[in-house]
Design a protein with these regions (language model features):
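Conserved, structured core segments of small domains
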Residues: 1-138
Length: 138
């Protein structure tokens, strides 16, 4: 199973303040542990929302709003993608993360089988082609 581990943005992150050398070293060690255990698949940190944009879809209308998104109470600051056997395993790994003050959400990623008969063989082949192309770029 794959899980997205979503780290909520902090005031410091939204202000563009980067973590200290010590915090980065602790997180680097943690990421190495995840990698050695075969859990770690991907990790990305996000720029502050002031450098982002939102696009709202309503029928054929597209409305773009530039950041920052100060009205939002929960912004994403970054994420991991993990491979674990269960939600409990993912939570267990997360409990060992070297965060001092953070809120983190874990969500299971849909697998192809979750979509049932609507995910036809043709759609499955299309997704496999797209994934193969993306992986070749990495």
């Amino acid at each position: 199973m794959k899980f997205m581990v979503i780290v909520k943005a902090t005031k410091n992150g939204e202000a563009g303040k980067l973590p200290s050398k010590e915090v980065q070293a602790a997180m680097g060690k943690y990421n190495e542990e995840l990698t050695k255990a075969g859990v770690f698949l991907a990790l990305e940190r996000l720029q502050p929302s002031s450098r982002g944009a939102r696009v709202k879809f309503a029928g054929n209308t597209r409305t773009v709003t530039d950041g920052p998104f100060t009205e939002s109470k929960e912004l994403v600051g970054g994420f991991w993608l993990w491979k674990c056997d269960s939600m409990e395993e993912a939570i267990g790994w997360l409990k060992h993360a070297p965060f001092e003050d953070a809120e983190v959400e874990i969500r299971q990623v849909h697998e192809a089988e979750d979509f049932g008969e609507n995910f036809t063989g043709e759609l499955r082949e299309q997704e496999e082609r797209v994934r193969a192309t993306v992986e070749a770029r990495a």
